[in-house]
Amino acid sequence: MKFTRYCRSLLSTPAMAVERYTKSHQSGADIAMVDLEDSVPPARKEEARRLAEEFFALPSTKLARSAVRINTLSGPDGLRDLIAIARYRVKPDLVLIPMAESPRDIEIAAGALGADCPETEFLAVVETPLGIEHAPAIAAAGHRLRGLVFGSADYTFAVGARLSWEALAHARARVVNSARGAGVEAMDAPFFEVTDLAGLRREAGLARDFGFSGKIAVHPRQLALINETFSPDEELLERARRVVAAGLETGRSVTVVDGVMVGMPFFEASQRLIEQFDPARPDVPPQPHVPSQPGVPSQPRGSHHPQGDSPTDIPTMTEK
């Protein structure tokens, strides 16, 4: 399983709901997003762009990232959104590109933002049959593309499927495999039943076990459960501590921990897990990355990510 604090959860706030901006930043979501797309009626798009600028000027928690979902780039509003964003005083950390169907969508967004937003990165929302088919190419669209987001509602309507986990399992698996193959993150679609926390727990657990990094929330009450599901429990953290301790003791040579053979990839993944989720362990010193030997997985693309952003892959006790 992969764990990261980069995108366990995302909470969307309509651009017109200015009174909710502050709460969004303080919600506990890893990504606080203002929405210019579905939640804004066509007649108020320009007003929404003006209001959304204030979303990025508000104080946020040190771990939260700010994001904006633009309109689809197949119409004029998407480009208008990007032109407006490029002029914002404070730039967003992330731009979500909806209805992504080819790498060209990411290229257009990067070109429109230009030199005005050099640090802004992208998440591509894959939510059409063509987007699912082209997901591998979209995921590899460039170093500013940080992940794929599965959009279940639009995809379901497009193919005529049921909005259920079983019916959409193939599409979800393709999104995850495409993202992981390119070394980027994968976020699952929302669970739309706001009051059904048991259903959310089940679906979030399935998404985690599928390989997703996190899940979109449609209501703040979903965030705590989503963050918990996509974070390691104490048992996994304790195992990571034992793996790191064994690596320090053996000089990071191959050894056995809890009956499982572990080597360099295990040491590095356990180290990252502790650095991200167990900050009370200052006694575990950061270790430099050592290039892997042939046949041994190395750090994926995304090793340029800031400290604490890269995913952490920890095998379970039963894995060999």
Residue ranges, per PLM feature:
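Expand to "…catalyze enediolate/carbanion chemistry for C-C bond making/breaking, isomerization
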Residues: 1-289, 293, 299-320
